[in-house]
Amino acid sequence: VRDGAMMLDINMDDAMLDAKEEMTHFLNLMASDPEVARLPWMVDSSRFEVIEAALKCIQGKAVVNSLSLKEGEEVFLQRAARVRELGAALIVMAFDEEGQATSYERKIEVCGRAYRLLTEKLHFPPQDIIFDPNILTIATGMKEHDAYALDFIRATQWIHENLPHAKVSGGVSNLSFALRGNNYLREAMHAVFLYHAIKAGMDMAIVNPSTAVIYADIPKELLEVLEDVILCRRADATERLIAIAESYREQPLQAV
C-alpha cells in the first residue's frame, strides 16, 4: 500500500492452509486497517468456494481473479452469475476446454466467446468484465514463444476495439521468468512491456510496485534490445538480450 498499489490482490491458495478459513480471517484483519481498507481488493483463488466466502466478507466492490471456460459453459455461467449476485467485477482468463490460449487468434476467440456468453446470457455489466489474455514467458530460446508478448498486446487492442467497455489485465511477472535472478532486467522488461501494452489499451496489471523500473530511465542500448524481444522485431533478439544481460545483473532497483 505504501509503495503505491492501487488495488490489492489477495491469494491464500496453499496446500498447507485451509484457504477458505484463512482468506476470511485475513480479509477481516484487512478491513480493520483504514489505510488498507480504503483500496479496492481483488480476491485471487483457483477454488470458487474460497472466492465466494471472500466476497461475503467485503463491503465494497471487489474483483474476482478469476474464472474461465476451462470446465465448460455451464460451470462458467453458474459461477459468473454468483459473482454478479455478490456485486463483484470479474477477471476472465483466456482459457477454455481446449486449454490456455497462447496465440493471438486463440486469445481473441476465447475472449470473444466469454464476452458474448456473459453479456447475452447473464446480462453481466460489460464494464465489470476484465479479460486476462495470458501474459506468457518470452526470451526462452524457443521460437514458438517469441511472439507471446506481441500477441498479448495485439489481443488487448482487439478487445478494446471489439468488446465494448471490457477491460484488460494481466500478471506481468510471468513475462520474464526466463530471466530469473536478474531482477533489474526483469523489471526493465516489465516496464517496456507495460509501455506498449498500455498504449494498446491495457487497463490494469498485477505488479510489485516496490521494484518498478521507469521506462524513461532504461539505458538506450537495453531499451532497444528489450523492444526487439517484446515486439518480436528480430529473429536474434533473445540472443542479443542474453549477450548483454550479465552487465545489468548488479543494477540496483529503486522504489518509484
Q: What are the functions of these language-model segments?
A:
Residues 18-45, 49-59, 149-168:
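Alpha-helix-loop-beta-strand connector modules within alpha/beta enzyme cores
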Residues 20, 58, 62, 72-77, ...:
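Active-site-adjacent loop and "lid" segments of alpha/beta metabolic enzymes
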Residues 54, 131, 197:
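Conserved, mostly hydrophobic/aromatic
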Residues 157, 163, 174-256:
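Active-site loops and adjacent core secondary-structure elements that bind or stabilize anionic groups
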Residues 9-16, 38-47, 62-72, 126:
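Catalytic beta/alpha-barrel core
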Residues 2-39, 98, 135-143:
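Glycine-rich, proline-tolerant flexible connector loops at the mouths of alpha/beta enzymes
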Residues 71-138:
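Conserved anion-binding
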Residues 16-27, 45-53, 70-82, 99-108, ...:
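Active-site-adjacent beta->alpha loops and helix N-cap segments on the catalytic face
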